[in-house]
Amino acid sequence: MAQRIFTLILLLCSTSAFAGLFDAPGRSQFVPADRAFVFDFQQNQHDLTLSWQVKEGYYLYRKQISITPTKADIAAVQLPTGVWHEDEFYGKSEIYRKRLNVPVTVNQAAAGATLTVTYQGCADAGFCYPPETKTVPLSEVAAAIDATPTPAVTQTSETSKPAAQLPFSALWALLIGIGIAFTPCVLPMYPLISGIVLGGRQRLSTGRALLLAFIYVQGMALTYTALGLVVAAAGLQFQAALQHPYVLIGLAIVFTLLALSMFGLFTLQLPSSLQTRLTLMSNRQQGGSPGGVFVMGAIAGLICSPCTTAPLSAILLYIAQSGNMWLGGGTLYLYALGMGLPLMLVTVFGNRLLPKSGPWMAHVKTAFGFVILALPVFLLERIIGEAWGLRLWSLLGVAFFGWAFITSLQARRAWMRIVQIILLAAALISVRPLQDWAFGSPSAQAPAHLNFTAISTVDELNQALAQAKGKPVMLDFYADWCVACKEFEKYTFSDPRVQQALGDTVLLQANVTANNAQDVALLKHLQVLGLPTILFFNTQGQEQPQSRVTGFMDAATFSAHLHDRQP
């Protein structure tokens, strides 16, 4: 008897241990969205907390989270900072892993009030889920006396344009500041400023001279840092509006005008009366003393010359776009430090370190005009799309390298011939996208992609299966938000081996980007958890579950899968 019981226990254990060996090959390795992103909420009067428990190997997109109240008023939602994730098609995106808590302040909620929460995530293995929508019932909350009304709809995804996505970082501000120091409006002033800082004294120790110059630069940096903090704080209040297409176009026009001022078409500077007052205030300070030197530096930060106004304005607009106060203050501090480094060198070592003035300083100013022109191209690229953005970058590159090449022709040194060849080659490379646009791209000769027949409902699928006339059918699910779907199109479906293997197969595709009721019904009918998912049907119109594909496959793997699948 005991032997039989022992045998039965072994049988049960072996069945449990090896059950996975007999699972259907087509079974998805991915869990449903509700298990990948476990959503929960908790309300305590005015305080509501939305929480997600994110499964290991999965992540949520920050920009895909939106919160919309109904019969309720909530404060603006501030999503926490995520971690950066980058892919080929969507670039950098902020994501959340492991756990996410979002606090929401409910100013007022009537009877039957709800909160509609939409979110979307993917798996690291290249599998993305359709947008999930949850309805959160709210308890009645009376409006506080000092509650400030907020807009009825809070779209947190609009605020997810982080400063790091802008084309230059705060470190670039240091290099720009150093470059501005060599423009014709700034460089000739350094010997004069150095003399004022030292109070006209020629015999000071090196340490004392360096200290006074450093204090002057810190005074100037304080003014710029405060300006950066103010602009960043203002930009934070209007950050969502700063992402509107009309606002982006307006900013692009402003940046273009700033660049034109660097080209000498017109002059930007403070009114002369205000500059005179600031100069008089600076002259009242005593040179050679730390306090007086610091005040002179702080006032000097307010006096913008024609060469510094445009770059400073561009950096301020960049900071306003970011809405990041730490970045705003730090960027302007580094910019002022970059402008002050040459002054410190002149104060300590004298004028012998300065290069001689000449036409080259005007060329430095013009070069900064091209740098500023890169900003409107970056902003417009969000509106006009990647293709037109590439053409604008191409046009800017041709203009810059062409100008640099023509300018270099004035040089007489032999080694400049090598520089001229490099500049000419860079201009020819930059013109390539414009050439492809005007005369057609050689890539147009690339193998054609698969010719899919679009379906969107269960009835259309059944009709297509009935019309297949004894041929096998492949159904591909596609969405614009699915990165791996785009990889399938670019790398897998364009491969000749794959196209040959699918030569006798009827190709269907369901675009579920909208994730509307029809899309949801089709996904539910076929038990599709997420994308990419590819289904195969035999000649009788029956799905072959063991052949189902979930997740990305390269051309070689997918081609082998096509040959191995059952007819």
Curated annotation (Swiss-Prot):
- What EC number(s) would the UniProt record show? 1.8.1.8
Q: Start and end of every Thioredoxin domain? A: 435-567
Membrane topology note: Multi-pass membrane protein
Give yes or no: UniProt keyword Hydrolase.
Answer: no
- State its location(s): Cell inner membrane
Q: Which reaction does it catalyse?
A: [protein]-dithiol + NAD(+) = [protein]-disulfide + NADH + H(+); [protein]-dithiol + NADP(+) = [protein]-disulfide + NADPH + H(+)
Q: What are the protein's UniProt keywords? A: Cell inner membrane, Cell membrane, Cytochrome c-type biogenesis, Disulfide bond, Electron transport, Membrane, NAD, Oxidoreductase, Redox-active center, Signal, Transmembrane, Transmembrane helix, Transport
GO molecular function terms listed in the Swiss-Prot or TrEMBL record: electron transfer activity; protein-disulfide reductase [NAD(P)H] activity; protein-disulfide reductase activity
User: What EC class is this?
Assistant: oxidoreductase
* Protein's GO biological process: cell redox homeostasis; cytochrome complex assembly
**Disulfide bonds, which pairs?**
122-128, 185-307, 482-485
**Entry function:** Required to facilitate the formation of correct disulfide bonds in some periplasmic proteins and for the assembly of the periplasmic c-type cytochromes. Acts by transferring electrons from cytoplasmic thioredoxin to the periplasm. This transfer involves a cascade of disulfide bond formation and reduction steps.
Q: What name does this protein carry?
A: Thiol:disulfide interchange protein DsbD
Organism this protein belongs to: Salmonella typhimurium (strain LT2 / SGSC1412 / ATCC 700720)
